[in-house]
Amino acid sequence: MASGGGDDGLRRRGCSCTKDDFLPEESFQSMGNYLKALKETPSRFMDRIMTRSLDSDEINEMKARSGHEMKKTLTWWDLMWFGIGAVIGSGIFVLTGLEARNHSGPAVVLSYVVSGVSAMLSVFCYTEFAVEIPVAGGSFAYLRVELGDFMAFIAAGNIILEYVVGGAAVARSWTSYFATLLNHKPEDFRIIVHKLGEDYSHLDPIAVGVCAIICVLAVVGTKGSSRFNYIASIIHMVVILFVIIAGFTKADVKNYSDFTPYGVRGVFKSAAVLFFAYIGFDAVSTMAEETKNPGRDIPIGLVGSMVVTTVCYCLMAVTLCLMQPYQQIDPDAPFSVAFSAVGWDWAKYIVAFGALKGMTTVLLVGAIGQARYMTHIARAHMMPPWLAQVNAKTGTPINATVVMLAATALIAFFTKLKILADLLSVSTLFIFMFVAVALLVRRYYVTGETSTRDRNKFLVFLGLILASSTATAVYWALEEEGWIGYCITVPIWFLSTVAMKFLVPQARAPKIWGVPLVPWLPSASIAINIFLLGSIDTKSFVRFAIWTGILLIYYVLFGLHATYDTAKATLKEKQALQKAEEGGVVADNSCSAT
């Protein structure tokens, strides 16, 4: 796909901050140009829907727009600890108590298993893409290549939402554990403004301060951040081992007598929210551009960190519910309060310290990941190209880091955790589902190579997989006791996947590392992610729809025209270069003949 334009200007400006760093495209150079662009919106929109990027464009062309290269300093060791640091802390120390008490009881461990399996399926999809397309854009870049510009933009907006909201949730929980460490209630450190709505009236200045410190750590250099992360993560793992061992010594099996007080529905409802605990792994995929050997290091780092994470989550969930009846679990600081309840008041300080360490690394890795997402999104001119600039000295995207963490701090200052967690899960599941779809498209459809017959068969089977998965989720949400619907929807999903496996030939094989059991694992990832979406409350979907509506307005007014102009400018540059090269060849041949 032609998707360049403005490259020379960006290189010339380095890290400047001028008008052209924000709206350099032709459509925004005058009001007349802009009005003309708006009139052409339908045709431009169709162009962006039908246009797909190329692996080579993402790897070479897009990277050049940052002016400077990111430094390749990371190994599998760094990626593994980045994955562990990104994930462990957010789920265990933020949401486990909340979900065990309100939705699933002791069966919260099953919720972690369900969300963990779904996350592992997504990890496989991300890993293949990250190895094949090792750039900072993560899922945004993958969707640009396989599903086109428009779907990539919708994903990009939700990626931004995912990271900003996720960081805000963890920053607010950081305050809760800090208060516990000092023998205070979280509200002692928050400012209550009754004039604001109930969900936005508990202002959190400590969360803002934490975001500011993380910002400084994230911009100084990725290798330095990695050292800080794995030292902090190792300390955190020691605390986790203490919690598991010490917790089991205070276990009471009577607390497991009512294992599923909220039924199977509660297990899946919690699983949808607890998916928040696994989102850190996609931040690791954005570091592919800074990895020394992506083909080896990314699979080890991503898959390895997810295995460690899932085991830790399940063991700690079991420990918590054995220590204390689920009705008495504290939703804000569950482990600290649980140790106090069994007479180990001193242990809560170890737990609080470990939680603070864990949430600090979650924030740090999230800050690194979200800045790299934003950088690649800006390289595509879907956001101002000023955000794509990479600092020559540090090799990090300072502009994107500061902007994203400022937004995180603002939301953390106002918004309660429950709203953040529900909204985040919708966005995350939506993106992971589309990455699985993109993986199937990558394997089964190659432009110019796949026959029309095979393409049409693939689209039919993919549509049936999506439709049957959606129908299963809707039936689950609407029918609490019935089972007849599943006898229709599940076989359709199964037979559609079988048909894709045996009736549609794969058009492309991965060069280095690939997802096993295609199409089964991507198809299962699609089904599970959509099913978990069906377990989320209606209000969260309303907020998600509002945010998507805002994204569409921005896209129609700005993003569409910026990317269209950039694509056309780059196409002209390529054509001019090709003509020049052809002219040079002709001249050389003439000289030889002479």
Swiss-Prot record:
Topology relative to the membrane = Multi-pass membrane protein
Q: How is its activity regulated?
A: Inhibited by the protonophore 2,4-dinitrophenol.
The PTM N-acetylalanine maps to 2
| Compartments, as annotated in UniProt | Membrane
List of glycosylated residues: 102, 255
Tell me if Transmembrane helix is a UniProt keyword of this record. Answer: yes
Q: How does activity depend on pH?
A: Optimal transport of histidine at pH 4.5-5.
Q: Which GO terms describe its cellular component?
A: membrane; plasma membrane
State whether keyword Transferase applies: no
Q: Could you tell me which residue ranges are on the Extracellular side of the membrane?
A: 100-104, 171-201, 249-266, 319-348, 415-418, 479-483, 533-543
Q: Which residues cross the membrane?
A: 79-99, 105-125, 150-170, 202-222, 228-248, 267-287, 298-318, 349-369, 394-414, 419-439, 458-478, 484-504, 512-532, 544-564
Q: Which GO terms describe its biological process?
A: amino acid transport
Q: Which UniProt keywords apply?
A: Acetylation, Amino-acid transport, Glycoprotein, Membrane, Transmembrane, Transmembrane helix, Transport
Family annotation (Pfam families): AA_permease_2, AA_permease_C
**Residues on Cytoplasmic side:** 2-78, 126-149, 223-227, 288-297, 370-393, 440-457, 505-511, 565-594
Q: Which GO terms describe its molecular function?
A: transmembrane transporter activity
Instruction: Tell me the superkingdom of the source.
Output: Eukaryota
Expression by tissue, per the entry, reads: Expressed in roots, stems, flowers, petioles, seeds, siliques, and leaves. Mostly present in major veins.
Which family does the similarity line name? Answer: Belongs to the amino acid-polyamine-organocation (APC) superfamily. Cationic amino acid transporter (CAT) (TC 2.A.3.3) family.
List the PANTHER family hit by this protein, alphabetically. CATIONIC AMINO ACID TRANSPORTER 1 (PTHR43243:SF1), INNER MEMBRANE TRANSPORTER YGJI-RELATED (PTHR43243)
Relate the protein's function as given in its record: High-affinity permease involved in the transport of the cationic amino acids (e.g. arginine, lysine, histidine, citrulline, valine, and glutamate). Transport mostly basic amino acids, and, to a lower extent neutral and acidic amino acids. May function as a proton symporter.
Name-wise, this protein is: Cationic amino acid transporter 1
Per the UniProt record, the source organism is Arabidopsis thaliana (Mouse-ear cress)
- Gene symbol here is CAT1
